[in-house]
Amino acid sequence: MKNIYKTILLTLISISAFGQKSEIKKADKLFVQRAYVDAADAYEDVADKNQEVLQNLGDSYFYTNQMQNAAEVYKLLFLRHEQNVAPEYEFRFAHSLRAAGQDDEADKYFASYYDREIAFEDFQASIVDSSNLFIYETTMLATDNSTSSDFGISYFGEDQISFASTRNTARPIYPWNKKPTLDLYSGNISEEGEISNVVLFSDVINTDEHESSAAFSQDGQTVYFDRTNEKRFKDTSGIRVAHISIFRSQMVDGAWGEPEKIPFSSEEYSVEHPALSPDGSTLFFASDMPGGEGSFDLYKVAVNEDGTFGTPENLGPGINTEHREQFPFVSENNTLYFASDGHLGFGNLDIYKSEGDYSEAENLGNSLNSPYDDFAFIIKEGEKKGFLASNRSGNDNLYSFTRAQYIKKTVEIEIPHEDRIYFAFDKSNITPEYQQVLDQIIDILKSSEATEIQIASHADARGTDEYNMDLSQRRAESTKNYLVEHGIAASDISTIGYGESRPVNDCTDATGCTEAEYAQNRRSVITFSTMEEVVEEETK
């Protein structure tokens, strides 16, 4: 009887193991086909998730913008298999953590990946440049199809735009996200930045393949755009994938002519996201062609007067990283804007700009960039407004924005003494009279949207240098605690005690001054930074 039970148990284990292998095989097939939505569901059904299952499940969530789920799966992956996990999973895990709001953990994995210290708070502070800070106010555009993905926006003439969308339900379903393939649309722009009269582009342009990211010449007679190649090509892993090429079409008798693939496109790699310089003499694009810095790089190529092209040039390491640089746009003042997840940023794709020789990339800050993908940025510099795409709401959506330039202004507030004493002799507690003054200061800090608040506190000359230094620091901390208790963020406040080293009068000795004169040095000074909009004077 015991042998019978053992046989039954072994049979059940074998059936279970066979079922597990079958589930993994099914999920792996979907993953290889880049059907990530279905792959995630299939991998979730696997009871005993090994390292490869966790890697692929995490990636399936990551590539479909389910960052909270991705972070949870990658966390389990690293808890179980940290010593054997390839570096690229650190990179994706760190981005998932950033999107999930776990910045300290994200810093840890970014630091491990890049092999250098990463401090997100320091990066945020570095974005504030007193000479060149722009604040963006973004608004999601209303759409008549909330389930579609909309991005790849571009200017089309004076009052029109073009964008890519999955809203055409007559197109084939794309396994990656289970939405229709992309088509190009056009629409009118209102003064408020709203889009209306949205219509499909010509059937000469749109096909059952993906079309996106159009770029138009200034006269509106030439368009460059992305289209997925019909032919699939085996990548280094032996997986058949469809790469992307740039096509060009000319307006003939009021209609778009048959598109032609530009000559440096290929079946073996992608060439995508065209953008024209203001004078139309240079075409910018993204590509993962061999010889770049890694993944997708940005390139430029001369467009000759006869319509032929020069030799593509990589924009170099100031712009390009080992990760993705995509969606270039060149404004009327020849500033290059682009999206990247390889430079340190606020999460996933961020928008950057570069001027001059493209030797440096500058992040546009967190009034524009989110912890998710922000990309396809376009702007009319003179009007200080434009558009971008972002999946910060969970789906690719279009946003309009207005931009204002600010300077950082440092304001100093010193608590008035009059006949009052800031701190009693040898004390650091806040008196009721002083609380009333601090309440007024708090109102100023809140109304000014103050940042980088510093409290510097002082002592009189009575007592040892060491004791007075400690006493002044306690006074600074006491002042800070009062501000924090009344709604000022502790992270915005720093404190420093100067002891008796910075008197406001000549009372530098322990004797020789009146009590009122000594009292003037028992004080706190509060300084803070605030942003002041740059008002441009109208030229006459």
Name what the model sees in each region:
Residues 24-131:
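Alpha-helical protein-protein interaction scaffolds
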Residues 149, 212, 417-421, 426, ...:
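Envelope-exposed proteins and targeting segments
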